[in-house]
């Protein structure tokens, strides 16, 4: 089955592009807006609409394969590729990429993904991560349609993985609405919750960590109030390095605080994402490796999750090699081609470290659906409900696609 045409259209994501540098320097909120001047090249405002480019591959039989190019909320910052806008990148797709797609035989996802993710260059440079992300999604969908298979089945077959028609735990994020959205997550029986966005010491963590401790107390009580004794979600809190700030990155003290949180969270399993941010890749790897060692030695029932400085496939491999944490987040758009997402999950599992197939609130419904198929094939420990920050919408998109795929896999005899 060949591609006979390729179409591209501007789209919207589930959230916004935010200039992280300007926000760190004290940009002031005005409603949902930020006042002030952008600090990162490419930004015209501190907060801009989240943009996507919608990829449509027309196949010989008239079917259309879909994928969406998208970037993370903090596009253009933290060493990432430049800010991703449709205006800038649509011409590249139309003029440089479209001719290379037309006439391609859709016979192997891995081979095609390798070409567009790792070999193809424009003006001597690799394609933007967002372009590689969306193009490889569409290519996977195209191969699946050509073979009359689910995308999960294509990944399983090409990477020699078993087809297991069972759900992968879904992790929801509350955003700043810590209480109402936690209620929503509990009512809908989310597998992992609430993320909680603990990104500020004064407002959210507390100078002694007392505000987060109080929130976990409230959350545990609320789970029992709304759901009774049968519901046992994992409590997963992202602290954005703030715990390290209040303890001056003293790992023994941090471990002691995490032990207090774990005691309060019991009987629920506790994960803490990003306990420290050491400001560099190797500093982060060393700190999380030591912190994991302390936690394991002391028998503290908490798992730490690597996020900061763990961005590319190469980064993820380094964190896994050095056991820098109990789990690594795989931020799907930052990896470029979804072939790298598959490799990242499989590498983490091979190394005995937890795999969290994450991403960003700033993706699309389509990229989230395709992430579901990657998760069903590779079996990470959890995946993110995305896109958006409203909780309900992202959970609906991911949960429903997962249930559809599982039902079809069962019908086809997946075991």
From Swiss-Prot:
Catalysis: reaction(s): (2S,3S)-3-methyl-L-aspartate = mesaconate + NH4(+)
Cofactor: Mg(2+)
GO annotation terms (biological process): glutamate catabolic process via L-citramalate
GO molecular function: metal ion binding; methylaspartate ammonia-lyase activity
Site (Transition state stabilizer): 195
Domain of life: Bacteria
Broad class of enzyme this protein falls into: lyase
Active site as annotated: 331 (proton acceptor)
Pfam families noted in UniProt: MAAL_C, MAAL_N
This enzyme's EC code(s): 4.3.1.2
Residues that, per the record, bind Mg(2+): 238, 273, 307
Sorted UniProt keywords: Lyase, Magnesium, Metal-binding
Pathway involvement of the protein, from the record: Amino-acid degradation; L-glutamate degradation via mesaconate pathway; acetate and pyruvate from L-glutamate: step 2/4
Family under the similarity heading: Belongs to the methylaspartate ammonia-lyase family.
Quaternary organization: Homodimer.
Stated role: Involved in the methylaspartate cycle. Catalyzes the formation of the alpha,beta-unsaturated bond by the reversible anti elimination of ammonia from L-threo-beta-methylaspartate (L-threo-(2S,3S)-3-methylaspartate) to give mesaconate.
Name recorded for this polypeptide: Methylaspartate ammonia-lyase 2
Organism: Carboxydothermus hydrogenoformans (strain ATCC BAA-161 / DSM 6008 / Z-2901)
């Amino acid at each position: 089955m060949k591609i006979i045409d390729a179409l591209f259209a501007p789209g919207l994501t589930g959230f916004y592009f935010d200039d992280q540098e300007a926000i760190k320097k004290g940009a002031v909120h005005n409603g949902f807006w930020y006042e002030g001047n952008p600090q990162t090249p490419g930004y015209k405002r501190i907060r801009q609409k989240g943009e996507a480019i919608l990829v449509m591959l027309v196949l010989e039989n008239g079917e259309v394969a879909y994928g969406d190019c998208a970037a993370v909320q903090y596009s253009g910052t933290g060493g990432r590729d430049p800010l991703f806008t449709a205006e800038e990148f649509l011409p590249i797709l139309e003029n440089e990429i479209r001719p290379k797609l037309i006439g391609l035989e859709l016979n192997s996802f891995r081979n095609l993904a390798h070409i567009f993710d790792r070999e193809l260059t424009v003006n001597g440079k690799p394609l933007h991560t967002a372009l590689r992300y969306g193009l490889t999604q569409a290519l996977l969908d195209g191969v699946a349609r050509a073979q009359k298979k689910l995308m999960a089945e294509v990944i399983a077959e090409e990477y020699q993985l078993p087809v297991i028609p069972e759900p992968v735990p879904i992790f929801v994020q509350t955003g700043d609405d810590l209480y109402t959205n936690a209620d929503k997550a509990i009512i809908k029986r989310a597998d992992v919750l609430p993320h909680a966005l603990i990104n500020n010491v004064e407002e959210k963590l507390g100078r002694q960590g007392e505000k987060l401790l109080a929130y976990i107390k409230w959350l545990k009580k609320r789970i029992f109030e709304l759901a009774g004794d049968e519901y046992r979600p994992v409590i997963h809190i992202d602290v954005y390095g703030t715990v390290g700030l209040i303890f001056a990155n003293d790992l023994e003290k941090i471990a002691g605080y995490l032990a207090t949180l774990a005691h309060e969270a019991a009987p629920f399993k506790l994960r803490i994402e990003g306990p420290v941010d050491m400001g560099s890749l190797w500093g982060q790897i060393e700190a999380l490796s030591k912190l994991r060692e302390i936690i394991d030695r002391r028998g503290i029932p908490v798992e730490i999750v690597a996020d900061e400085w763990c961005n590319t496939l190469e980064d993820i491999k380094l964190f896994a090699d050095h056991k820098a944490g109990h789990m690594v987040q795989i931020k799907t758009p930052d990896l470029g081609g979804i072939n790298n997402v598959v490799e990242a999950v499989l590498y983490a599992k091979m190394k005995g470290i937890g795999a969290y197939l994450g991403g960003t609130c700033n993706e699309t419904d389509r990229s989230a659906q395709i992430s579901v198929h990657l998760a069903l094939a590779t079996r990470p420990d959890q995946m993110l409900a995305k896109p958006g920050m409203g909780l309900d919408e992202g959970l609906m998109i991911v949960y429903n696609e997962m249930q559809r795929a599982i039902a079809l896999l069962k019908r086809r005899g997946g075991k």
